Swiss-Prot record:
Compartment list: Cell membrane
UniProt main location, coarse: membrane
UniProt keyword Lipoprotein present: yes
Lineage: Bacteria, Pseudomonadati, Spirochaetota, Spirochaetia, Spirochaetales
Organism: Treponema pallidum (strain Nichols)
InterPro entries (alphabetical): Cu-R_lipoprotein_NlpE
Keyword Membrane: yes
Signal peptide, first to last residue: 1-21
Name of this protein: 17 kDa lipoprotein
Amino acid sequence: MKGSVRALCAFLGVGALGSALCVSCTTVCPHAGKAKAEKVECALKGGIFRGTLPAADCPGIDTTVTFNADGTAQKVELALEKKSAPSPLTYRGTWMVREDGIVELSLVSSEQSKAPHEKELYELIDSNSVRYMGAPGAGKPSKEMAPFYVLKKTKK
């Protein structure tokens, strides 16, 4: 099992350190036996994904999501060309991979630390990109809109 996970991590370009993290995650991950969940988890660990998501009241929202290897996450949003929201909003929380391979983030705004956690879903497209799917139950973006909801992996 560990050899196949190493091979998968190598295929995804995770590297030796990431491969070691992936192998170790399979021993504690509740979805360790699920190949799709393992693939998603290996691709996301330590990854930073960025893009501009559509918005109704501005040209877009510059979005950066960080999936830390310890299961914590951070999301930073900045509304483009919007004078009423000039500073970025920062959310912190946790992430997990569901059995179906969908990534679920549980986030709370740093300004509202006592507020309930917001849940967001992401779909792994390939080892270098994820698609924002919104809140649970919202459904995937339409085929025409799907390309506008993609975040690409960045180096830092």
